[in-house]
Structures are given as structure tokens and as C-alpha cells.
């Protein structure tokens, strides 16, 4: 009987997560005057523009530090470059967890990298707030230590389809997308929403990454005559697609893009307002980038990073950093990793003042932001919209 009991005890110990084995784990990366936070992002490579999200988040850390920190502790960012590459991302995560022994992780661009990191981070048990990457697979199925602080692909995909159908008399919807998981994370929930409303896409087209001509796809669209097009494409391919739409006389058809594109950047890429005048994008914020509600955040980033050129990506991770600080403040000075996880699960309807939708995390659901606004050009000015013709 003793042998059986001992065997069960050994099995239970082996099956328990690493963070339950060692009390010292609870305060690893924590001192009396600092909280170390591992910040991973593509600080180099072709996707380095996404790292602006990490810069905005770290500017917020510095703001909090200048105000005295959280219960006397400064937020200390330990940066690691993923270059938007899964292998480099895995190496970065392992270094931060095992070598640097940070208290928690926050950040991460590039969904493919973040999905690859999930098993390592989940096994480690350390808190991880995903602050830019959108793939649902990062935070679902539920992992107790992983939290999404931005709208996921499914939230954005449904928001895209909802906006499309808010345009009166929209019945014929076409979709063009990349063939990767990132694109599907938008298009699949968009199609689910359309189906719920009794609409099946009239056309589903693929445009691969790196493709420099969309003539074949545009000619098919000309035959289908859609009322609206959903485009799950990266910025470079979006610009090519919009140019070819105009070239073949389809420039009046509105196009709904993802959070992976930026309205102003798309205008810069095309170099022609007529090409983008009917282009709309998911917009996670309460105002235009140069609007009064965003001014204090822009000033904050410029204070700490005066040479930083601001874009849509610059602001996306700040909201989840605010939610983190709020949770840390509520815990008090006696901080542990388990207490932080529990406090994050108590965040309800947290108004960040920057994201268009609040953050709510519960023990059953760690995908905290359930909706998004849309941005488009109205009277040739970028405008945040709740629905077709309805400013935010």
C-alpha cells in the first residue's frame, strides 16, 4: 500500500507544472525595487516595423517608472529580438525564461512566432501577456498563464464582416487572402459571421505573399461583381491588389482590410488617394492617430523615444500594459507570479482610454478584447467608424 501511495505521489509530482514545484519560482525576476519583464519583438528584419508596438509599450513602462513605479518597483524591460522568425523566437523565449529568469513576458508580434512559443511558455508557467500578435491559437485553448491583450483574429474577423454588412444592400461579398494561418485567422471567423447572417461568399481567392501582380484575381472579381471585398493580405500585397483593382475599373468597390495593414501606410505605398479612397482597415483605437484622444499617448512615446516615427503599430500594446499595471497595483507589494495570474483573471471592462474596446479577462476566457473599430477615409480624412457612415 505504501508503495502504491508513493507511486501516485511521484506521478502527481511529475504531472504538476513546473511552477508548483518550487516556492522560489513565485518571485523569480522580482526584487524589492524591480520587476523584470521579457519583451520579445521583431527588432530587426523585414517585419521590424511591428516592433513599434514594443517601443510604445516600453515608453509606458518608463512613464510608470518616472511616477515611482508600482509599489516602489520599477518595470525593467529585457529585450530579445525574434526577427519575426519562429526559431529565433523560441531561442529568445528560452533565454528570457531560463537564463535571464524574468518575472513575466509581455509583447510579441508575428502570430507564427507566438504560436510556436506557446508550448514553451505554457510549460514554464510564467505570466505572458500577448500585446500585438492576433492568432487565436496563442491563447486558446485556455492556458492559465497566457493572456491576450489585443483583439484576436476571430474578434477582428467578425468585426470586419460586421462592418461589411453594415453597408446598406450588401449581399454579394468576395474574399481574397493569403493561404497562411494568419490570413485564415481573419477570414474564417469573417465567413462564420457572414454565414450567421445568411450570406456565403460569392468568391474566395488566394493571393500569395510576395506576389507582385493581382490581375488574375481582379479579373475574376470583375465577373463576380461583389458589393464588398474582404482582403486578408499583408501591406505590400494589399497595395498591389488595390492598384490592380483601380487599373481594371473596380476601384469603386469597397475593400475591408485587416489589422495587419495601416490606412496611412497603404496610402503611402500606393501613392494615390483614388486607389485607397474605398479601403477600410480594422482600427483598434478610440481615435485617429493624430486625434485629440491619442495625443497624450503620442507625446508619451516621443518623450522617451524622440526619434521614433509613429504608426498605427506604435499604440497597440499600451492598453495591455495599462491593464498589467492596474493588476499589479491591486495586488500590493507582496507580489508573486500566481497572485499576478489571479489578479489578471479579475480584470473586468477595463477602459484603457486607447483601445476601442475594453479588456476583460476571466478564469474561463483569456482573450480580453472582443471587438474593434474600423478606419477609413471620410472627406479624404482618416476617420474612425463604428459602422458604415457612423463615426466612432
Predicted segments — roles?
Residues 22-25, 49-55, 67-140, 207-214, ...:
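Beta-alpha junction/loop-to-helix N-cap segments that form part of ligand/metal-binding clefts
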Residues 245-318, 382-392:
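Extracellular/periplasmic periplasmic-binding protein-like sensory domains
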Residues 1-36, 66, 391-392:
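Short, low-complexity disordered leader/linker segments with a strong preference
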